Amino acid sequence: MDYVKLGKTDLKVSVACLGCGGSSALGVTSGKSENESVNIVKEALNLGVNFIDTANIYGTEKIVGKAITNLNRDEIVISTKHQVTTNKKKYSLSEVINGLNNSLKYMDIDYIDVFHLHGVSPRDFDYAMSLVPGLLKEKKKGKFRYLGITESAPVDPEQITISKAIDTDVFDVVMLAFSIMNQNAKKQILQQTSKKNIGTMSMFVVRSLFSVPGRLKDEITKLVNDQKLPKWLLDETEPLEFLLKNSGAKNIIDACYRYARHQKGIDCVLFGTSSIEHLKNNIKSILSPQLSLATVKNIDQYFNHLKGVGLDFPEKILK
């Protein structure tokens, strides 16, 4: 496993970060037993992953807690999150703090390494900032070590929230969407996070766009019809197979993880899974060498103008 320092924090994290939400949610959404889900986390730890990301809304914090029982807490980096708003309500400071306390209880830990404000949309950013002073008081109590923020990628393709967050100099860590077909963060944001030494976690690297059969082909067809991609892409037997020629990648998902992993400004790559087989494959991809320079050039040439592609909410969101 490769490890990096997460921005200006003193956290040394694995470049592969196990995401416990999304459509996979450690197999919870596909009916796996709690023990099976716990074993996925344990196997990730056995393979050198020391960075685990969850959230109160995922319903997987208790699973994470059981997986890390009796392990050296100082060797594991835990990231969790709480929403500040939903479509129906705004969470008060006391409700967010209660969520923080519940996270500690569910995982049976004394502190959280990174506590994020979760899925903050641009319209809710100011409200999220109003909660920060109160949360920093909880930080002083030792409940969490670093404050982070994650964007709501499906409603914020311009990544306005992360841009604003960087300007506040309040957040130690940010989580943003980045992929082969969604490179918006390269234009300014990654330069800004690097300049300010803000820890940067990448999500939406694969998601359903690349993992659900037929989804990528449908998206490419739509983009070609909208004149955003060249027509010859429709002539390929498999979607984006031209990228794999002499790239070093085994398949498009392998290419996705490798592209994100070696993007300057990104510290770690989040991946989700519901099986140990996929867990091993994902980690292997993230630890593989950079794609060939010619392949990277093609990715940048054909897709760097796209925005908001592949940014969809998980098909199942746990309540």
Tell me what each language-model feature is.
Residues L71-S94, H118:
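Structural motif corresponding to the early beta-alpha repeats
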Residues L6, L18, S37, I52, ...:
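Conserved, mostly hydrophobic/aromatic
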Residues G65-K81, P133-K143:
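Alpha-helix-loop-beta-strand connector modules within alpha/beta enzyme cores
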Residues T29, K42, K88-I180, N184-Q188, ...:
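Glycine/proline-rich, positively charged
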Residues T9-A16, G48-F51, N72-I76, I109-D113, ...:
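Short, well-ordered coil/turn segments that N-cap beta-strands
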Residues G21-S23, A55-I57, K81-T85, L117-V120, ...:
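Active-site beta-loop-alpha junctions enriched in small/polar residues
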Residues I40-L45, Q188-K319:
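Structured C-terminal cap/extension of enzyme domains
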Residues M1-I76:
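N-terminal binding-site loop/beta-alpha segment at the start of enzyme catalytic domains
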